[in-house]
Amino acid sequence: MTQQAAEVAKRRTFAIISHPDAGKTTITEKLLLMGKAISVAGTVKSRKSDRHATSDWMEMEKQRGISITTSVMQFPYRDHMINLLDTPGHEDFSEDTYRTLTAVDSALMVLDGGKGVEPRTIALMDVCRLRDTPIVSFINKLDRDIRDPIELLDEIEAVLKIKAAPITWPIGCYRDFKGVYHLADDYIIVYTAGHGHERTETKIIEKLDSDEARAHLGDEYERFVEQLELVQGACHEFNQQEFIDGQLTPVFFGTALGNFGVDHVLDAVVNWAPKPLARVANERTVEPAEEKFSGFVFKIQANMDPKHRDRIAFMRICSGRYDKGMKMRHVRLGKDVRIGDALTFFSSEREQLEEAYAGDIIGLHNHGTIQIGDTFTEGEALGFTGIPHFAPELFRRVRLKDPLKSKQLRQGLQQLAEEGATQVFFPQRSNDIILGAVGVLQFDVVASRLKEEYKVECAYEPITVWSARWIDCDDKKKLEEFENKAVENLAVDGGGHLTYLAPTRVNLALMEERWPDVKFRATREHH
């Protein structure tokens, strides 16, 4: 095995998906703690400490306690290199989340044991299913009251349409939480709460059929043994291939806050989740062990660091290796660039990178030339597929409070649109600026970021736009004819693409009927 193949085999790149408040930020911290990437796991939102989770770094996130933007963290664990991507937990951020999930090889689903499967989890699982992403499940908050675990597994199967195979099983919950039993290997892991940055020593009781186990479970012993018989009779057994195919999820129980069970999940990712996988490009399939470098940009993030007014493009490496100072071809522009200052992300700490391999996520400084979906190679013209833009569902007209700041407004919106935080449209017949979003919160985010980062205050006005469609037409003459007739509703988006802003559903249906040669697209691949 070459050194490069060995490095790729060590990589595990995964994202955490959950409904807001299921404990995603806490679990992120505890995972980093396992990899010793942060020394103090600050309890998020706690009154005792004002330390915020390092992955929730933007002002607005700090106020609302939701991770609005994906951040990337790399840390070592058991001779492996883990790349952890945090996804926005709020329902308004489906585009950003979708694109993040195109950059990973597996996902960790965190469920609140008291609530079970929630709407946001369902939406994220739908996205994972599009790519058959393997899912590891963690049922969290066993230090509180939870629903019946068998009921929770049934719900995962019924609602998320995936087989659930419990690997560990909880012994009690809330004040009676005594630990978990490992179903396949017949041992008990005793619960001792470890808060903050404490990593408690694990106490193991070998064999359920032992005096020590009987003493630990006390009066609950007989009932627990009966429950286990039921579980083992009714539940699926773990099957590696079904997991890799995205048809079965191994389920673990624990409490991230009490620092218990998180290591079981990380072990599962290392032992079972796939190493970096091959990627489909328009031209061919790219294997991770190929010598030549290739990668695609799945996210652009403005102002990650108030100290540096900058934009960072996040790139997933698909093949080869990155070496500091190497020359790459920016395929869309057909330009060669030398990249000497790529970054890796150790939580919110940035470090200059010397080398990186397939599966790693690196950050490139972006001075406005890089767009989402861009491919970088060592010369080959490749375009990776499946990184879409979605048509927004909500629209607002932007009104400036200070008319002298229109230049800053345009610049700010252009940058925010580039990173996928919003979509911006410039109608051909007016000087209006129209914003499109997938959820209402996105408008708040844009307004607060314009104010914080670009010193521009704006207000929103309602506008009669039902939906946007990207226009495509092979017949130049027909396209010109269409542009003349439909000019009242035509706009150009932030990337310069012609867009039809349909005032109503009926109008769109009529236009599609009237112009059969014109394609009205609801999604647009990033070219």
From Swiss-Prot:
Main location: cytoplasm
Positions that bind GTP: 18-25, 86-90, 140-143
Gene3D superfamilies membership: P-loop containing nucleotide triphosphate hydrolases, Peptide chain release factor 3, domain III
Keywords of the record: Cytoplasm, GTP-binding, Nucleotide-binding, Protein biosynthesis
Signal peptide positions on this chain: none
Annotated ranges, domain tr-type G: 9-277
GO CC annotations, alphabetized: cytosol
Subcellular location: Cytoplasm
Alphabetical list of Pfam families matching this protein: EF-G_D2, GTP_EFTU, RF3_C
Molecular function via GO: GTP binding; GTPase activity; guanosine tetraphosphate binding; translation release factor activity, codon nonspecific; translation release factor activity, codon specific
Biological role stated in the UniProt entry: Increases the formation of ribosomal termination complexes and stimulates activities of RF-1 and RF-2. It binds guanine nucleotides and has strong preference for UGA stop codons. It may interact directly with the ribosome. The stimulation of RF-1 and RF-2 is significantly reduced by GTP and GDP, but not by GMP.
NCBIfam families, A to Z: prfC, PRK00741.1, small_GTP
Similarity annotation: Belongs to the TRAFAC class translation factor GTPase superfamily. Classic translation factor GTPase family. PrfC subfamily.
Protein name according to UniProt: Peptide chain release factor 3
Lineage, opening ranks: Bacteria, Pseudomonadati, Pseudomonadota, Gammaproteobacteria, Pseudomonadales
Underlying gene: prfC
